[in-house]
Amino acid sequence: MSYKKSKYFLIARKRRIKYFFLNKNSQITVVFFHGFMSDMIGAKPKEIQKFCNKNNLNFLKFEYSGHGKSTGEFTKGNISKWTKEAKELINSKLKKKNKLIFIGSSMGSWISLNLFPVFKKRLKGFIGIGSAPEFLEHLMWKKFSKKIKKIILAKKIYNLENGDFTYPITKQLIFDGRKNKVLNNKINLKIPLVLLHGTNDKVVPLSFSRAILKICKKSKKKFVIIKNGDHSLSRKSDLKKICNELRDIVNNIRLA
């Protein structure tokens, strides 16, 4: 999918955040949060956008600074900064009366969880896809060797190789992640909460989705374990499941 009809949102007078807003004049807006070093033009946002267009729902997607076509250096980004960017964009582009449904992919679920308290009165549903809250500490730092940790602590960039991708990891990224812990907090929102996770996810264990379920005490929870699904959950069958769950949440909101 291309960046057709996307625009830039200016933050702090210098960071330009790439975003796309589908305005169907609906009372419901679906917001998509992409993952670590990902973008807004993949299969999931594409399919969700098509669903929203067909079902008369507003849809907002965007790219954090240092990602995709947004400006800024990736190595200067962190969870706090990306959360703030998402908050400012949502507040600027969406009407205050809009009911929100957040969809977080991998790291996007962490950003979403950070924003639960901010939008608690408007948030009416959440879908997490291969959710990875606090992954910087549990999937990176704790597994790094002493040699790698020494490189990072010396304020150097460690390039983490993962398949075809290279992730530049910095000290400030790791340390900022520790300021954004969410798994020790209780979430008391009474909203539909659906977590989808593939059994063949080699990046993020199922336990991360289970951890979210544990802290959401009052939500109407559903855990969808997808057989043979990988981390991206971008097969046609995966995308259909995601949109089916979204449809259920939307129907519940409209019937309320």
Where are these regions (language model features)?
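N-terminal cap/lid segment of alpha/beta-hydrolase-fold proteins
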Residues: M1-K24, R235
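Short beta-strand element of the alpha/beta-hydrolase
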Residues: Q27-G35
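Short substrate-entry loop that stabilizes the transition state in hydrolases
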Residues: M37-A43
